[in-house]
Amino acid sequence: MNIDDALLLIREIPDYPKPGIRFQDITPLLADGEAFVAITEKFASYADSSTLIAGIEARGFIFASAVANQLHSGFVPIRKAGKLPHNTISESYGLEYGSDTLEVHVDAVSKGSKVLLIDDVLATGGTIGAAIELMHRLGAEVIHVLALLEIDGLPGRATLAAKYPNIPVTSLVVS
């Protein structure tokens, strides 16, 4: 299956989880083996010189772990606060109404690691920005950011470009 056909499997659910939201449901894409492979192969094509693949909880894990498997690379889970059992570092980021925190194990990456960072959605850039900060604090270099979906009209891309002008950001779908 080609990438364009795979992306057509994403369905929009209007007014979910609340009125005015157009939720992008990726479960039909995930359920189709050929489509899922097409997406992970496309993501893997951006790996270049990466030594690790990092994924952001929760749906970023799905794609990042599959890409890591395909490339025979390590996978780094970046999780919400309180979900990792060992020593962690954390990074908080702003939300529309409040804040949230991401964590990663202190020994998850080695200094000098080259990280391909994957998430499912790029919206405001807050979550991805926090993940980049975590990688930088551990001495890793984020070589590329990938998102399956980018929400048009939100400042995510501009926010990331302003703060991290040397990190390319690629989204497969902008809606």
Where are these regions (language model features)?
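PRPP-associated nucleotide enzymes
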Residues: 1-175
